[in-house]
């Protein structure tokens, strides 16, 4: 069975509590439950991983390379805008990457408009709340089909 790794970056464990105007009131636990349901509907295995520690995220990405995951969906949170370490780790992957964000990063503060991950990703989905993850999983599923 194909496997997709969903990565949640810094501060995303605070979904449901942090800035509901941008992120809504759905918790990360609820988001991960939906992700599992959507993955089952799409016919692949999924693992969700969240950390607030950049080195742990890089290590999980390195492990994904060794595991030959079939696709990665990532919401790196604020790391999106400045973490060359996360970007360098992602560059190692052979699997397609889909970047997602709950809020529209291009309609927010200027510093959020730039993504150091975007150039590595097959595409970016943002601004659709929790549905950004659903759309990201659909994109990952389609990319897996195309690449196999």
UniProtKB/Swiss-Prot annotation:
Residues noted as binding substrate in the record, renumbered to the chain: 75, 81, 88, 102-103, 112
User: EC number(s)?
Assistant: 4.2.1.10
Gene3D superfamilies recorded: Dehydroquinase, class II (3.40.50.9100)
Q: Where is this site: Transition state stabilizer?
A: 18
Catalyzes what?
Answer: 3-dehydroquinate = 3-dehydroshikimate + H2O
The record's listing under Pfam families reads: DHquinase_II
CDD domains assigned to the protein according to its UniProt record, in alphabetical order: DHQase_II
- Which keywords are on file for this protein? Amino-acid biosynthesis, Aromatic amino acid biosynthesis, Lyase
Q: Give the protein's function.
A: Catalyzes a trans-dehydration via an enolate intermediate.
Quaternary context = Homododecamer.
Into which family does the record put it? Belongs to the type-II 3-dehydroquinase family.
Q: What is this protein called?
A: 3-dehydroquinate dehydratase
- Species in which this protein is naturally found: Syntrophotalea carbinolica (strain DSM 2380 / NBRC 103641 / GraBd1)
